[in-house]
């Protein structure tokens, strides 16, 4: 045992010698002995005894030796250093003689010297080596903890703070965008609202359908051009309501190829819808979110409800859509009728004409009618799908086309692709939409994907697209802008009780939308649409899809759609896409939004 221990000890000594030669060449056993003596006289004596009497204290010797090597390994460096610094002679004598007294003296001196170190280290341990141990551990731990905690704090805080900052930036940017849009559109919007409440009626009522159709056709042609172009994506996003209706005209005229499936859908119901659009879309493009369109929507809705058939549903959804933002809704309504047109070409056009007229005439009254109509419509329209769709389209203009379409019930997604854009979006967004109407589906898909991308984030671009791309028709553009931003609605909402709910929804939707926004293009967009749509619904009138997007969304809906449409599917109107995703997304939300929207819409009507 003793020999084994001695061999181990020698190995340790060699190791430590080699290690500390650089520091200070110690005598052969000075390090080990000094450390052992300084730390534990007993282990030191025991090793001695082990050397002298290996058989007597094997276990204790072993213990002592093990302790000594341990002490050596851990503290031999510090002790050796201290010993040398304090009293090399004493350390040497202690190591050679291994007298209990010298080591204590060296130990005391060490203590004295290391007591300062101890204090510095704040380690309560008596011996320097324990101090060192503790210090090392504690310092490491503290450092680690500090760094980790800092890292954790930073990481945890940074994501949160980043998120918060992002949210703030988003809010700020949105508010800025909305302000910008308001400023950009404000003239157009205030004019739009003027145009729409008065001009809505004047447009829809005052403007002869032919006039509206002519302007629409011109705009449609522009829009169809835009649609064909990439900018049309953005524009179609703004144009979701207008270009789609226009596309309907164009598609009726053979723009189908240019506008795609959406155009096809339009072409299907385009000729009948053209007339309705002449009005409904006119007020759609011009009226976008004005409550007059909403009111018109309600009247159309009541009519559609009276009809009860796909036409009825269409009018319902259309009413909701119109009511919702009436701008997109109506535009999409036309689209939807067109979309529906594919499904309900006959009923949808007739209904639409009627609905358009109905929408157009009951501007303010309809706001309330739409309100009452909106909720019942949501409930009435195919209970779940219609609700989701009705609500959806209520909340989102594009939604309305789907809801409006006889097939809206068929699929909330279909609701999403309520307009041409809607169709495209629905198509991409929801199989049901595709199944509803193959033609429609493809447009839906485009629209949807488009809308989804530009829905909220790109709302500014969409609005700009609307603004710059579609400035040609000033009244319409203004109406469209207003409908997009629904700035009056938005402003009202902020002041109005409905605004409270809408805003809450907005914040709620705001969070999901960023994640879901891309989703609308795919069927998964249903869920995204749900959350997004529900929030949108709350802003219902302002931005069917960006209703709640009150910030810039309300006016930026088209923009955001347009951006999205650019990103996703430049062919479709992002706006209807966005709306669509919204509409499908949340039936309950859409209902809530419908209510909230109704109140907002009536607010808008009253204000207008």
From Swiss-Prot:
User: In what ranges is there compositional bias, type Polar residues?
Assistant: 322-339
> Could you mention a single GO BP entry for this protein?
regulation of alternative mRNA splicing, via spliceosome
Give the primary localization class. nucleus
Q: Which UniProt keywords apply?
A: Differentiation, mRNA processing, mRNA splicing, Nucleus, Phosphoprotein, RNA-binding
User: Compositional bias (Low complexity) at which positions?
Assistant: 188-200, 289-299, 389-420, 428-459, 518-555, 574-608
Q: Where is this region: Disordered?
A: 34-246, 261-608
Stored InterPro entries: SRRM_C, SRRM_Domain-Containing
Task: Enumerate the transmembrane spans.
Answer: none
Compositional bias, Basic residues, is annotated for: 107-123, 131-187, 214-228, 478-494, 556-573
Q: Where in the cell is it found?
A: Nucleus
Q: In which tissues is it expressed?
A: Specifically expressed in neuronal cells (at protein level). Expressed in adult nervous system and sensory organ tissues.
Keyword Signal set for record: no
Composition-biased stretches, type Basic and acidic residues, lie in 78-100, 201-213, 460-477, 495-504
Q: What happens when the gene is disrupted?
A: About 85% of the mutant mice die in the first few hours after birth and few surviving animals display balance defects and exhibit persistent tremors. Mice show impaired development of the central and peripheral nervous systems in part by disrupting neurite outgrowth, cortical layering in the forebrain, and axon guidance in the corpus callosum.
According to its UniProt entry, the function of this protein is described as: Splicing factor specifically required for neural cell differentiation. Acts in conjunction with nPTB/PTBP2 by binding directly to its regulated target transcripts and promotes neural-specific exon inclusion in many genes that function in neural cell differentiation. Required to promote the inclusion of neural-specific exon 10 in nPTB/PTBP2, leading to increased expression of neural-specific nPTB/PTBP2. Also promotes the inclusion of exon 16 in DAAM1 in neuron extracts.
Q: Which family does it belong to?
A: Belongs to the nSR100 family.
Entries under PANTHER family matching the protein? SERINE/ARGININE REPETITIVE MATRIX PROTEIN 3-RELATED, SERINE_ARGININE REPETITIVE MATRIX PROTEIN 4
Q: What is this protein called?
A: Serine/arginine repetitive matrix protein 4
Naturally occurring in which organism (per UniProt)? Mus musculus (Mouse)
Lineage summary: Eukaryota, Metazoa, Chordata, Craniata, Vertebrata
């Amino acid at each position: 045992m003793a020999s084994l221990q001695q061999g181990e000890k020698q190995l340790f000594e060699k190791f430590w010698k080699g290690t500390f030669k650089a520091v200070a060449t110690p005598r052969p056993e000075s390090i080990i002995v000094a450390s052992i003596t300084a730390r534990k006289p007993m282990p030191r004596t025991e090793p001695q005894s082990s050397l002298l009497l290996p058989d007597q204290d094997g276990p204790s010797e072993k213990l002592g030796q093990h302790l000594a090597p341990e002490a050596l390994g851990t503290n031999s460096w510090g002790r050796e250093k201290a010993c040398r610094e304090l009293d090399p002679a004493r350390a040497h004598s202690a190591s050679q003689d291994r007298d209990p007294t010298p080591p204590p003296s060296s130990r005391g001196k060490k203590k004295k010297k290391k007591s300062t170190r101890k204090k510095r280290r704040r380690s309560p341990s008596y011996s320097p080596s324990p101090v060192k141990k503790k210090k090392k551990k504690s310092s490491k731990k503290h450092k680690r903890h500090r760094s980790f905690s800092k890292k954790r704090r930073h990481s945890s805080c940074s994501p949160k703070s980043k998120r918060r900052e992002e949210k703030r930036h988003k809010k700020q940017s949105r508010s800025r965008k909305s302000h910008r849009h308001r400023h950009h559109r404000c003239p157009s919007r205030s004019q739009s609202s003027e145009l729409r409440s008065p001009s809505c009626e004047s447009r829809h009522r005052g403007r002869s359908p032919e006039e509206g159709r002519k302007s629409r056709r011109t705009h449609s042609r522009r829009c169809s051009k835009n649609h064909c172009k990439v900018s049309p994506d953005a524009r179609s996003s703004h144009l979701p309501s207008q270009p789609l209706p226009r596309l309907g005209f164009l598609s009726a005229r053979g723009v189908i190829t240019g506008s795609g499936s959406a155009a096809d859908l339009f072409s299907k119901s385009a000729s009948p819808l053209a007339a309705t659009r002449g009005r409904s879309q006119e007020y759609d493009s011009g009226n976008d979110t004005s409550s007059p369109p909403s009111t018109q929507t309600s009247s159309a809705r009541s009519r559609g409800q009276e009809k009860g058939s796909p036409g009825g549903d269409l009018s319902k959804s259309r009413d909701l859509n119109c009511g919702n933002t009436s701008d997109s809704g109506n535009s999409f309504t036309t689209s939807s009728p067109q979309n529906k047109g594919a499904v309900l070409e006959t009923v949808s056009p007739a209904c639409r004409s009627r609905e358009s007229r109905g929408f157009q005439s009951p501007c303010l009254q309809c706001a309330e009618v739409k309100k009452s109509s909106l909720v019942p419509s949501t409930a009435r329209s195919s209970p779940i799908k219609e609700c989701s769709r009705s609500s959806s389209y209520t909340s989102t203009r594009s939604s309305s086309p789907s809801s409006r379409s006889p097939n809206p019930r068929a699929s909330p997604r279909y609701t999403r692709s309520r307009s041409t854009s809607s169709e495209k979006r629905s198509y991409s967004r929801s199989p049901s939409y595709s199944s509803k109407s193959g033609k429609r589906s493809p447009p839906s898909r485009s629209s949807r994907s488009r809308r989804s991308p530009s829905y909220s984030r790109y709302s500014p671009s969409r609005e700009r697209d609307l603004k710059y791309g579609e400035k040609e028709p000033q009244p319409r553009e203004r109406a469209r802008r207003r409908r997009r931003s629904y700035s009056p609605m938005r402003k009202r909402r902020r002041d109005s009780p409905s605004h409270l709910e809408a805003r809450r929804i907005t914040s709620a939707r705001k969070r999901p939308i960023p994640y879901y926004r891309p989703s609308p293009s795919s069927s998964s967009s249903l869920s995204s649409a749900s959350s997004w749509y529900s929030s949108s619904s709350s802003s219902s009138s302002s931005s069917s899809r960006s209703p709640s997007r009150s910030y810039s969304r309300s006016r930026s809906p088209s923009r955001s759609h347009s951006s999205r449409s650019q990103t996703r599917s430049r062919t479709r109107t992002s706006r209807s896409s966005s709306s669509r995703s919204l509409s499908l997304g949340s039936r309950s939300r859409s209902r809530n939004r419908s209510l909230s929207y109704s109140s907002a819409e009536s607010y808008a009507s009253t204000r207008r």
